[in-house]
Amino acid sequence: MTTRETIFLYTDGAASGNPGPGGYGVVLKCGDLRKELSGGFALTTNNRMEMLAVIKGLESLKWEGARVEVYSDSSYVVNTMTQGWKRKKNHDLWARMDSLCARFNVTFHWLKGHAGHPENERCDALAVAAYSRPDLPADEGYNTGESQELF
């Protein structure tokens, strides 16, 4: 693979309850190569999982400067990255995403979810399977608002 080849990154995030157990699913494609990633947390939100799907996909790439086409059904992610929506929450993940996007030539595309797109459907299945696993870890960046900052 060369940096001139386009990498297609399909993502989805899901949560059972919002907040609740959540998962992300990723499908990466480049030429004949394909890779799938997934993971989940015991208590999180769908938006955090949508963001984490993009982050985990970008973190898995080894070619600095590669052209990456991100396809997500999350208007939250796509419009924040392309239309400058205000970032009120999830600052930890936005910082990670910005840092990763700076390493690649990334373009974001919105794609209608649950509309029969094979890669999006696969990402959704991976996300749901991930949050259905027992003994999910804590999402350390998720703040339930129950704890107060002391300083």
Put a short name on every predicted segment.
Residues T6-P21, I55-R122, L126, A130-Y131, ...:
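RNase H catalytic domain
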Residues L9-T11, Y24, L37, M51:
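Structural detector for hydrophobic anchor residues on beta-strands
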Residues M1-R4:
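A short acidic-Thr-Gly-centered motif at the start of a beta-strand
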Residues G23-C30:
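Short beta-strand scaffold segments in enzyme catalytic cores
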Residues R48, L52-K56:
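Short amphipathic alpha-helical face segments that pack within enzyme cores
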Residues G31-M49:
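A short, polar/acidic, helix/strand-boundary loop motif
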